[in-house]
Amino acid sequence: MDPYKYRPSSANNSPFWTTNSGAPVWNNNSSMTVGTRGPILLEDYHLVEKLANFDRERIPERVVHARGASAKGFFEVTHDITHLTCADFLRAPGVQTPVIVRFSTVIHERGSPETLRDPRGFAVKFYTREGNFDLVGNNFPVFFVRDGMKFPDMVHALKPNPKSHIQENWRILDFFSHHPESLHMFSFLFDDLGVPQDYRHMEGSGVNTYMLINKAGKAHYVKFHWKPTCGVKCLLEEEAIKVGGANHSHATKDLYDSIAAGNYPEWKLFIQIIDPDHEDRFDFDPLDVTKTWPEDILPLQPVGRLVLNKNIDNFFAENEQLAFWPAIVVPGVYCSDDKLLQTRIFSYSDAQRHRLGPNYLQLPVNAPKCAHHNNHHEGFMNFMHRDEEVNYFPSRFDPCRHAEQYPIPPCVLTGKRDKCIIEKENNFKQPGERYRSWAPDRQERFICRWVDALSDPRVTHEIRSIWFSYWSQADKTLGQKIASRLNVRPTM
């Protein structure tokens, strides 16, 4: 069934003004009244329709990633990885797949400035011949927590105070003082990378661990990385204040204007691979979303390029109604047992159904471009015209059959039901290595940002001491420097 065939036609193809039902409107300037100065009549259907439609223009904003901008383009394979995956869209160099990409800030509201210190979303929807593939990531390769059970509380802590609606450091530092796994993410967020110059000069990452499966059924863990061809650029504090003060939508404008001018942004896609049989060789768990995979041991392998060469036609239809879901994969790609990814698989689709309705995948921007067939019928805002008589399976009256079986990871799981943490936490090694890799001036800016955050008057001595301890375990001199700036002697 073609989801585009029965779309409502655009109102712009009429030479005159009409109501939603197509009736001609001869006056769109005045309400119907009794005489010149009398009361407005309820029978003025056009007025009622116009106001009722206006009252419902806004839909619930995303609980995270509310502020965003989208663009369209293509992904082209440049390197053969068929030994790793049987995914059709990766079948050979030169193959192109249409995409739509949404960039976003994470925590703040839909109209917030794009210069705030905040992670950035980097989500790509591939419209492949075997269905859509949503690679839903961020600009940082790690995350704050490794188990989705903590995600709602984490977002609550990062969001504004429910009493004052002000984002406050004491709430953030209090919550994450219970989660030393967050140190690695903070080594990115409080670094210079914390405020990208714009979306074009920003890296992307799939963040979670996925799996690639080849035709023989061999599976590998995989991490996805996007590298901008124009380089990475960021804004320091004074620059961010200046840019944000002049235009709170500067990154959206930069993306739109660049594409309109023919200066198409481009990213190279790289992957890192781990054989699941070798996962015990590392001092970290490959399914731990708070860890990066060392590139000197697990080098980046080139796959293809992403080019954005077309602006969206309508912001609401192709940005606000654009919906991603990490569970949407294609044959040859599979979700791993990464705890955060497993919870995202449920949460994203549940949020989209709340925000857009149960048939959100029928919206043109979310619908697959390839032929598709199932018995998912009816529900709120179902606008697919279907005339079949058989809406069950199997049936001798419907020739539709099962697709050809494709490989999935052949893993065998044993264990008892439990709520537990992973064995290899190793929370301090990677953030310490990252800090020591910076030049002294970059280290100094990082320290100043932490001093500023810990200077919040509602941050208690206990919370400060915990953070001094954490950063001392990552790098002994770092914890000491932060403590000395606050005139506090660290406990270790």
Curated annotation (Swiss-Prot):
Q: Name one GO molecular function term.
A: metal ion binding
Swiss-Prot/TrEMBL induction comment: By 3-aminotriazole.
Tell me which UniProt keywords the record has, alphabetically. Answer: Heme, Hydrogen peroxide, Iron, Metal-binding, Oxidoreductase, Peroxidase, Peroxisome
Q: Does the keyword Coiled coil apply?
A: no
SMART domains attached to this UniProt entry = Catalase (SM01060)
Q: Which InterPro entries match?
A: Catalase, Catalase_AS, Catalase_clade1/3, Catalase_core, Catalase_haem_BS, Catalase_immune_responsive, Catalase_sf
Gene Ontology biological process terms, A to Z:
hydrogen peroxide catabolic process; response to hydrogen peroxide
Keyword Heme attached: yes
Q: Where in the cell is it found?
A: Peroxisome
**Quaternary structure (record):** Homotetramer.
- Which family does the UniProt entry place this protein in? Belongs to the catalase family.
- Protein known as: Catalase isozyme 3
